[in-house]
Amino acid sequence: MFADMKSRKPSWLRAKLPSGVEYGAVRKLVDDNKLHTVCQSAQCPNMGECWSRGTATVMILGNICTRSCNFCAIQTGRPTELDIGEPARVAEAVATMRLKHCVITSVTRDELQDGGATVWAATIRAIRNRNPGTAIEVLTPDMRGRLDDLDTILDAKPDIYNHNIETVERLQKPVRVQATYDRSLKVLAHAGSRGFPTKSGLMLGLGEKKEEISAALQDLRNAGVTILTLGQYLQPTPKHLAVDRWVTPEEFADWKAFAQSIGFEFVESGPLVRSSYHADEQSAGITGVQELREGGSLASA
């Protein structure tokens, strides 16, 4: 399943090159505040487009992950100690970028007793205090399925809860070695049961079958997920899983139509789509987030 990267990418996978004043400003902001972004660490193909729009997805809890998923470019190993000043710097960066919608994610920190939940909560509250009109979307690890740690994060009241199942049930083990399909569905269902809008996503092109994709989407709907992202898997290095096939834009459009037909409220589906791609647009129709942007407040969850 591992191979070199000689296969030629199709034309529809050409991403925008980094450029412009906004791109430079975001890069300086990230560097000056000693922040990490999943855009850089995960080699996101949309970094040029998003940074040129003045947006970035901040990654907390360092940039070294305790897990070694076979699809992910983020560095793995022994993480550094927690940075107690990180929540305040993240909040200030959100203010500087004047974001109406921010996305925060993290590496997985399985060595921490609470999986980093306390830092997650502190970051959400710092952003809220500094930026009361900003919608906060969190993209978290599975917290080892510990719902008390997940509740620590949810008690800080993010506006959208995101956790990706990444692939279909059959391919979980080769793709996400230390995670499980059922555990991911459990954390999504728990967040949804507390009233949070929930979101998840899959990569296509890893060898999944059509019936497996439709089953995974139905499982997400059964777990209460309302926002969906579907994108093409891209092999980050020769040491990672090889691409099984290039999924066409037309097929992504078909999956979007199917997902909408089974009840997803918003679907972002395309070759270059990633979890936080156009996240502000994904949340635009969600009542609570819309009220927040218009100067109101979200109901307690």
Protein language model features and the residues they cover:
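Core AdoMet radical
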Residues: 73-89, 96-189, 199, 203, ...
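Nucleotide phosphate-binding site architecture
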Residues: 45, 66, 169
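Canonical Radical SAM [4Fe-4S] cluster-binding loop centered on the CxxxCxxC motif
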Residues: 4-13, 49-86
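Short, glycine/serine-rich, charged loops/turns that create anion-binding
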Residues: 65, 108-111, 143, 207, ...
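Auxiliary Fe-S-binding modules of radical SAM enzymes
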Residues: 1-57, 92, 98, 122-134, ...
